């Protein structure tokens, strides 16, 4: 009976992990935490002079020239 519970917990944990969005290799530049981190990211990587968090749930850093 303990093995059944162990398998059930294992299956549930795998399902929960599978529902989490995969982390893409593209850096977000501090988004969705703050626009200031995004701007700092843009300046330090020479992508632009300022930046702003945009997109759904403000999860993408858009660098502005």
Swiss-Prot record:
Domain of life: Eukaryota
Chief place where the protein resides: secreted
Keywords: Disulfide bond, Ion channel impairing toxin, Neurotoxin, Potassium channel impairing toxin, Secreted, Signal, Toxin, Voltage-gated potassium channel impairing toxin
Subcellular location: Secreted
Record's keyword annotation contains Membrane: no
Annotated signal sequence range: 1-25
SS bond list: 31-53, 38-61, 42-63
Cellular component, GO annotation: extracellular region
One example GO MF annotation: potassium channel regulator activity
Tissue expression pattern: Expressed by the venom gland.
Function: This recombinant toxin inhibits the mammalian voltage-gated potassium channels Kv1.3/KCNA3 in vitro with an IC(50) of 26.40 nM.
Family from the record: Belongs to the short scorpion toxin superfamily. Potassium channel inhibitor family. Alpha-KTx 11 subfamily.
Domain comment quoted from the record: Has the structural arrangement of an alpha-helix connected to antiparallel beta-sheets by disulfide bonds (CS-alpha/beta).
Protein name as annotated: Putative potassium channel toxin Ts21
Organism from which the protein derives: Tityus serrulatus (Brazilian scorpion)
């Amino acid at each position: 009976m303990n093995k059944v519970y162990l398998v059930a917990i294992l299956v549930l944990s795998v399902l929960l992990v599978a529902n989490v969005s995969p982390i893409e290799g593209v850096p977000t530049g501090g988004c969705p935490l703050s626009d200031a981190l995004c701007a700092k990211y843009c300046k330090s990587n020479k992508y632009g002079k300022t930046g702003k968090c945009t997109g759904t749930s403000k999860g993408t850093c858009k660098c502005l020239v």
